[in-house]
Amino acid sequence: MSRSLVFFFLFLVLVVPCLSHGTGGDHDDDEASHVKSSDLKSKSLISVKIACLVIIFVLTFISGVSPYFLKWSQGFLVLGTQFAGGVFLATALMHFLSDADETFRGLLTAEGESEPSPAYPFAYMLACAGFMLTMLADSVIAHIYSKTQNDLELQGEDKSNQRSATTETSIGDSILLIVALCFHSVFEGIAIGISETKSDAWRALWTITLHKIFAAIAMGIALLRMIPDRPLFSSITYSFAFAISSPIGVAIGIVIDATTQGSIADWIFALSMSLACGVFVYVSVNHLLAKGYRPNKKVHVDEPRYKFLAVLFGVVVIAIVMIWDT
């Protein structure tokens, strides 16, 4: 077996125990408290969210600057990105969308009735809205970048160097991905900030952090190729910006929970989780699965069958985790 595959599965062995701790460790506490509002505002829950804020920042920042000091396996990044995409997709559909739909049904069901009225799929509609809003943000960023490139050409940019033009295109894609992921990360962080229980917060933490670790490593490698003059300064700057985006979202989510009560908190939770579902689906499908990580040299695992197995493994992991969530 290639070294990249060994490294990849070793990483998974280290991550899965963290998943078990996050999902099962606080389950008894969740069942002991039947009053959602008190758990939502409890000091222990807020402490967990603050811990998540710090953890996601530190791990993302370290991952972002790591390519400057370490030489990551190309195969590991190819499979890791696909695995993260499977985790993101399964989390959005099996966890976020399910919880949002259940909350909407509870809010819209009158006392003494068994079915909501009206029986409109609000969670699914808002998930579509989150997907489209994220796509719109990507389109705006792409338009701004393409306009900048056209302006440079009109100012007399040398068109004879085709290799340089190809390089600039790949650089533009990398910058677009970085900016878009920073935008997405704010909303991903909100998913942690508005978590109803400590186990939900830990679960959202490991899911988002797993994705951000691979994204940060890939971002760091792209920056080393793009800006060779000051690679360390660039890595630190961009890694800090990317790492701080999710904690900002966590802080926003904590403020939302701390300033709302009763059904208002439930409405905000349902709305935010529905929109976050759309964001997660877009990021997983468009950025992680469709584009993925493009190695600068041929690697053995950069083939459809290996990518499919990595995505399948990510989905299966979430499917197993959801056994303890139901």
From Swiss-Prot:
Sorted UniProt keywords: Cell membrane, Ion transport, Membrane, Signal, Transmembrane, Transmembrane helix, Transport, Zinc, Zinc transport
Transmembrane helix recorded as keyword: yes
Single GO MF annotation: metal ion transmembrane transporter activity
Transmembrane segments: 50-70, 76-96, 122-142, 175-195, 204-224, 236-256, 263-283, 306-326
Membrane topology: Multi-pass membrane protein
Region forming the signal peptide: 1-20
Subcellular compartments: Cell membrane
Pfam families documented for this protein: Zip
Cytoplasmic side: 71-75, 143-174, 225-235, 284-305
Keyword Lipoprotein: no
Any GO CC annotation of this UniProt entry: nucleus
Segments in the Extracellular topological domain: 21-49, 97-121, 196-203, 257-262
Main location: membrane
GO biological process: zinc ion transport
Protein family per UniProt: Belongs to the ZIP transporter (TC 2.A.5) family.
The protein's role, per its UniProt record: Probably mediates zinc uptake from the rhizosphere.
Protein name as it appears in the record: Zinc transporter 11
Source species of the chain: Arabidopsis thaliana (Mouse-ear cress)
Gene: ZIP11
